């Protein structure tokens, strides 16, 4: 039941909530080999209501140190008589040496004249889909920094596939079990106008997150120091550039939560070029990945494991679809929509490009291009509208993933200048997608499953990695936020708590009824059921009778008669 029927348009002023960190843990003992020690901490409260966010600060910290202990490193295992010993110490099959392929990542197996090339005299390139297969995925939406796989390894095979985009054959890395080319183009335009920021933001965040099991908690910016010598991101295409990334779109849309009289429409375009599947066994991971796994302490230390997860991802891609996509969010002026009596259908006809299903990346869009109605020039065109002082489109927020940077810049420039994208600009971008495809969708597999069981202490490392993934998601959770008013939902975006309001409310905490709702005083504003926010789960109890339990509480700070849906206690086998 609602708490009454008369809503208050103003609540007491909200106090900004600043980020609060826990105390640092004790330093670990000094590592006698690296001469480095580590410590870590946690976020206790995330910034909210205009307070200081927990942004850019790491969970873990490291420091140079001195140690009198002797550095004891395990000697590399000796290769067998039927194996070749790489300069790095890695072992490969003897038959793979002197075959023209760098089966040793350092190339030491090819200090000789090739005598038996797998593909004979033919030279086949590995395409971008093959080189970047297995992309890492971060459960909180961040782009990982390093690919865990060695996709320059072929295991002496010459498996190839015909690339229908250029009619050339490409050689498949050993890790890729299957690569199919099939070009599919589609365009979707939102069926209705988003009347508020919160509905759009909720939709964007839900699409971005790998799982919604623990609410809308997203982290786009890495904060932990990389384990790599150079920070090189691995995913293909323009999606890496912050200016074009979907994470930037969410950040820009979130800035409109405090701006009134704005509506939104979305246009999504996608060109899918291929699907791939990784092998189910005997995957070849990179030597650097193995070295980083070995460098992780057997005694769990949160900060070091978090660094690994931000480098490689919490999961890798077992199956994936590659290609390119663009997303446009039109920020519209509500007053202009009303003045011009514009309908959703009229706006849809104006802002869509008109991508046909008959798509060929060599020639562009097949068939007749979509012709916009005559009213569109005056309705959407930014230059015309601004001269008349009746701008409908305040801004177009653009995301481009896949394709070359030059083509993406041209697309963005066209949209920024005209407010619309023309077919030619779209075609020019689409032709470059095959050169730099992005991962469009994926089937994830936990990253710890890539740790070879033959590695010393493999089970301990796998369990530590599994624990780190669970703690990583729990660290960046909305359970560390204050509850919202009037049925608003919580979201966590890069260390800052946001309230996503129901359409009738606005404000940092959804504490204000919208002005339109109060114009007719005879129709009181309904107060929606207040939702409390669950605290974070307490630590697990000791094991008793093969079971353990943990508890949480309902945070109703500042709310009246609020409740939380769900269980206070959960149990697990032990």
Swiss-Prot record:
The keyword Transmembrane applies. It comes from the Eukaryota. Glycans are attached at residues 3, 231, 261, 533. The chain crosses the membrane at residues 212-219, 235-242, 344-351, 352-360. Residues 77-117 form the LDL-receptor class A domain. The keyword Secreted applies. CDD domains: LDLa. It is a multi-pass membrane protein. Residues 18-72, 531-572 form the TSP type-1 domain. It is found in: Secreted; Target cell membrane. GO terms for cellular component: extracellular space; membrane attack complex; other organism cell membrane; plasma membrane. Its main location: secreted. GO terms for biological process: cell killing; complement activation, alternative pathway; complement activation, classical pathway; killing of cells of another organism; protein homooligomerization. It holds the Pfam family MACPF. Residues 481-511 form the EGF-like domain. PROSITE patterns: EGF_1, LDLRA_1, LDLRA_2, MACPF_1, MACPF_2, TSP1. Residues 115-480 form the MACPF domain. Disulfide bonds join 19-54, 30-65, 33-71, 79-91, 86-104, 98-112, 119-158, 350-376, 481-497, 484-499, 501-510. Keywords: Complement alternate pathway, Complement pathway, Cytolysis, Disulfide bond, EGF-like domain, Glycoprotein, Immunity, Innate immunity, Membrane, Membrane attack complex, Repeat, Secreted, Target cell membrane, Target membrane, Transmembrane, Transmembrane beta strand. Pore-forming component of the membrane attack complex (MAC), a multiprotein complex activated by the complement cascade, which inserts into a target cell membrane and forms a pore, leading to target cell membrane rupture and cell lysis. The MAC is initiated by proteolytic cleavage of C5 into complement C5b in response to the classical, alternative, lectin and GZMK complement pathways. The complement pathways consist in a cascade of proteins that leads to phagocytosis and breakdown of pathogens and signaling that strengthens the adaptive immune system. PANTHER family: COMPLEMENT COMPONENT C6, COMPLEMENT COMPONENT C9. Belongs to the complement C6/C7/C8/C9 family. Homooligomer; about 20 C9 chains oligomerize to give rise to a huge beta-barrel that forms a 100 Angstrom diameter pore in target membranes. Component of the membrane attack complex (MAC), composed of complement C5b, C6, C7, C8A, C8B, C8G and multiple copies of the pore-forming subunit C9. This is Complement component C9. It comes from Oncorhynchus mykiss.
